[in-house]
């Protein structure tokens, strides 16, 4: 029989070993009826020919076939019939969906017949080549690579925690780092080239829960860096308000040789209420001490005084510094500004903490100083004791062989005040103080505030050069084109020479107290330098960041590594930058292990309706210090039900904030021993366990707290509910007597248990 139909040709091509061009006659062992045969004329090349390879071996009587790899057929040709019925069409579609690509079955049931050689392929022990399909076309491989690239990109996006992670991964961590301030997790990540997530994970394993924007102190920074093999060098320097650095970097000046003698700048320092302002009142013939709120100075005040010596007038600039402990930065600033210092010590009070602090500031700044012992007109004053106390702080009077003049004075009667002024001028002459008025102006901001009529206003002490109207100044991140200059006598002037204290208008914003003011050539240059300085956080911003969200290792140890849930949020408006700095310095002294302090905003200016809205949104306490209310503020406060606290004395403000923090504390108790007893026997009464005890020390009280101790371990702590002697209820049992104790929630009494009775006394709430 000649096989010349298309079905058999394709079927044979899949199961035979070779295809030859010659015709072959095959005997069919299992003939089957073939349906739907369509005859067509074909060439000899299309005929199926089976030709056994003569070279194949016949080992063991088994016949091995060598199959040639069939050409890949189009999916459409899986149905070999040109004429389809509905059933065959559906079957082909189902097969295409299954996509069976792993193995070719010779006896596939999708054909309409069985090949006679199918038995051979089934019984053959081995086939010469694999029956697996050939590899897929390259197009499909390209698709796979493309999809892999997409998945890689997706993984990168998922893993990257921030935009700088790629740079962090590419940069190797440094061997050591230097820190000067507390850092946020983000800043630390950039500094040590370690991803934020790795830092947070490490701290979490240490039971320290932080966020990326949270500030951590040097102790935690050192712990993190040590974990990643990085050494830490702490260079936390005392804040001198940027004086030295700004002066060193001032390139607006040049040497001209036109130096002239300038008046000395004298700072008056000392403990609160020791008579600093009273002394200056006497010198200036004024009465500022009685005008000050609370009787204390709360800002640096600058005065120009003319001292007449032997018919010669000599100008002296005095700086009056606050003596309250909150104004440490102001005293430090005064010590750095001054040419000569006066340290006031009250004869009836002696050396106090702020006295010692002032001495340290002056000695560190290497400034000559005079000790003035005030209030010698009071009874009981003893200057010799004060001189002896000063020896502890390396201050030796001229009388004892030292170099520090000590002058007893009375600011009320004026006793020895002239001698004090003469001593100051002599020390100033020894310093040979000079300045060049031909240079551009250079000075320092003593105070600054926002005036509702004139805008930002600053008090400037000119140290060198001359300041003119229309000069361009750069003051930190602020700049100015001077519109008005007002001298110490409240007069408008056109220029100010060295050692002058003036008020200036025309600033772009309120500058920070202690900032250096430099005159530059043009308005454009001033703006550019101000923009450069904007990127550097001011001292006030640094202090606020360090105060807010502050976390230390000590804090976490004291709170058993629990998150601090108690928090007070504050919005504070002050009268000037100096007050702002003083308040932040005071608040930073409060420990935050128990209550977190969060300063949402602190700045000079009036209290406005916007502040009220912010307080309502952030659930903050709105506080004012020596400031006023803008129009509409009180109405907004009443509408939002926001209480505004306004203070005029700084220590009242600080104490009130401290009290608010303490009110949030949970009560703490101390245990006061009352008595001791021992369980002699245990008996039951109406299904209740009663401990028969003998009081061995002091007494037992009904409703008192007790600890039940067994084998030196506390097994129960609670209150005595019932205390009986025989059958009688009693309030207390004295030592040497027996009693019965019942506690409903404790029934596990045993003979020999020790009972320690105590009272819980509430402790005074404290943040420390």
Curated annotation (Swiss-Prot):
List the Pfam families: EF-G_D2, GTP_EFTU, IF-2, IF2_N
Quote the subcellular location field of this record.
Answer: Plastid, Chloroplast
Tell me where in this chain the tr-type G domain is found: 261-434
Entry superkingdom? Eukaryota
Q: Enumerate composition-biased segments (Polar residues).
A: 160-176
Primary location recorded for the protein, binned into one broad class = plastid
Output compositional bias ranges, type Basic and acidic residues. Answer: 54-65
Q: Which CDD domains match?
A: IF2_eIF5B, IF2_mtIF2_II, mtIF2_IVc
One term of GO molecular function? translation initiation factor activity
Q: Which residues bind GTP?
A: 270-277, 320-324, 374-377
Where are the residues of the annotated region Disordered? 1-20, 54-77, 155-176
Q: Which UniProt keywords apply?
A: Chloroplast, GTP-binding, Initiation factor, Nucleotide-binding, Plastid, Protein biosynthesis
**What do the Gene Ontology cellular component annotations say?**
chloroplast
- Cross-referenced HAMAP family, in alphabetical order? IF_2_B (MF_00100_B)
NCBIfam families tied to this protein: IF-2, small_GTP
The record's family statement is:
Belongs to the TRAFAC class translation factor GTPase superfamily. Classic translation factor GTPase family. IF-2 subfamily.
Q: What does this protein do?
A: One of the essential components for the initiation of protein synthesis. Protects formylmethionyl-tRNA from spontaneous hydrolysis and promotes its binding to the 30S ribosomal subunits. Also involved in the hydrolysis of GTP during the formation of the 70S ribosomal complex.
UniProt protein name = Translation initiation factor IF-2, chloroplastic
**Organism field:** Pyropia yezoensis (Susabi-nori)
């Amino acid at each position: 029989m000649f096989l010349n139909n298309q079905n058999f040709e394709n079927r044979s091509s899949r199961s035979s070993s070779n295809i030859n061009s010659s015709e072959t006659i095959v005997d069919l062992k299992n003939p089957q009826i073939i349906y739907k045969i369509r005859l067509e004329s074909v060439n000899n090349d299309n005929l199926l020919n089976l030709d056994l390879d003569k070279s194949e071996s016949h080992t063991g009587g088994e016949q091995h076939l060598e199959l040639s790899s069939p050409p890949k057929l189009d999916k459409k040709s899986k149905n070999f019939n040109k004429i389809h019925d509905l059933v065959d069409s559906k079957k082909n579609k189902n097969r295409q969906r299954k996509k069976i690509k792993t193995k070719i079955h010779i006896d596939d049931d999708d054909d309409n017949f069985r090949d006679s050689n199918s038995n051979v392929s089934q019984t053959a022990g081995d086939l010469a080549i694999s029956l697996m399909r050939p590899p897929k076309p390259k197009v499909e491989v390209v698709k796979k690579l493309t999809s892999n690239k997409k998945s890689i990109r997706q993984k990168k996006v998922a893993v990257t925690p921030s935009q700088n992670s790629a740079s962090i991964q590419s940069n190797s961590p440094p061997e050591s780092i230097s820190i000067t301030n507390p850092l946020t997790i983000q800043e630390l990540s950039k500094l040590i080239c370690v991803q934020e997530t790795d830092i947070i994970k490490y701290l979490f394993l240490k039971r320290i829960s932080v966020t990326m924007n949270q500030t951590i102190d040097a102790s935690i920074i050192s712990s993190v860096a040590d974990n990643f093999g990085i050494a830490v060098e702490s260079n936390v320097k005392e804040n001198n308000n940027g004086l030295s650095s700004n002066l060193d970097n001032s390139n607006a000046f040049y040497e001209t040789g036109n130096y002239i003698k300038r008046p000395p700048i004298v700072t008056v320092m000392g403990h609160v209420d020791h008579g600093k302002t009273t002394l200056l009142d006497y010198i200036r013939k004024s009465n500022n001490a009685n005008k000050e709120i609370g009787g204390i100075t709360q800002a640096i005040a600058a005065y120009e005084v003319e001292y007449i010596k032997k018919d010669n007038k000599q100008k002296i600039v005095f700086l009056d510094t606050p003596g309250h402990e909150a104004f440490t930065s102001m005293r430090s600033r005064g010590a750095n500004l001054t040419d000569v210092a006066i340290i006031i010590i009250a004869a009836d009070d002696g050396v106090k903490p702020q006295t010692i602090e002032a001495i340290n500031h002056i000695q560190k700044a290497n400034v000559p100083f005079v000790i003035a012992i005030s209030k010698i007109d009071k009874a009981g004053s003893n200057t010799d004791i004060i001189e002896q106390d000063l020896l502890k702080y390396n201050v030796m009077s001229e009388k004892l062989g030292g170099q520090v003049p000590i002058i007893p004075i009375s600011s009320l009667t004026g006793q020895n005040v002239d001698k004090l002024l003469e001593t100051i001028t002599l020390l100033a002459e020894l310093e040979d103080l000079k300045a060049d008025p031909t240079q551009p102006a250079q000075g320092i901001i003593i105070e600054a505030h926002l005036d509702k009529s004139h805008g930002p206003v600053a008090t400037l002490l000119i140290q060198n050069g001359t300041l003119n109207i229309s000069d361009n100044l750069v003051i930190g991140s602020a700049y100015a084109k001077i519109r008005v200059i007002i001298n110490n006598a409240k007069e408008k002037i056109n220029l100010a020479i060295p050692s002058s204290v003036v008020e200036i208008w025309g600033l772009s914003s309120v500058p920070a107290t202690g900032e250096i003011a430099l005159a530059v050539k043009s308005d454009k240059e001033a703006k550019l330098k101000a923009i450069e300085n904007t990127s550097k956080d001011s001292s006030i911003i640094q202090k606020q960041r360090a105060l807010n969200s502050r976390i230390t290792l000590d804090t976490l140890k004291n709170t058993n590594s629990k998150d601090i849930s108690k928090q007070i949020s504050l919005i504070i408006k002050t009268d000037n930058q100096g007050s702002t700095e003083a308040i932040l310095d005071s608040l930073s002294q409060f420990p935050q292990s128990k209550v977190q302090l969060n300063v949402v905003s602190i700045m000079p200016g009036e209290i406005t309706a916007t502040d009220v809205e912010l307080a309502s949104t952030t659930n903050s306490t709105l506080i004012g210090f020596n400031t006023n209310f803008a129009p509409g503020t009180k109405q907004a406060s009443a509408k939002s039900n926001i209480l505004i606290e306004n203070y005029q004395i700084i220590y009242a403000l600080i104490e009130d904030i401290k009290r608010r923090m303490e009110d949030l504390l949970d009560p703490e108790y101390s245990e006061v021993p009352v008595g001791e007893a021992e369980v002699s026997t245990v008996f039951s009464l109406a299904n209740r366990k009663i401990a028969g005890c003998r009081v061995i020390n002091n007494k037992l009280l009904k409703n008192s707290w007790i600890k039940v101790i067994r084998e030196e371990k506390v097994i129960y702590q609670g209150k005595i509910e019932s205390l009986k002697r025989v059958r009688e209820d009693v309030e207390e049992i004295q030592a040497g007597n027996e009693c019965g104790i019942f506690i409903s929630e404790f029934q596990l009494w045993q003979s020999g248990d020790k009972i320690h009775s105590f009272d819980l006394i509430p402790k005074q709430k404290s943040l420390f």
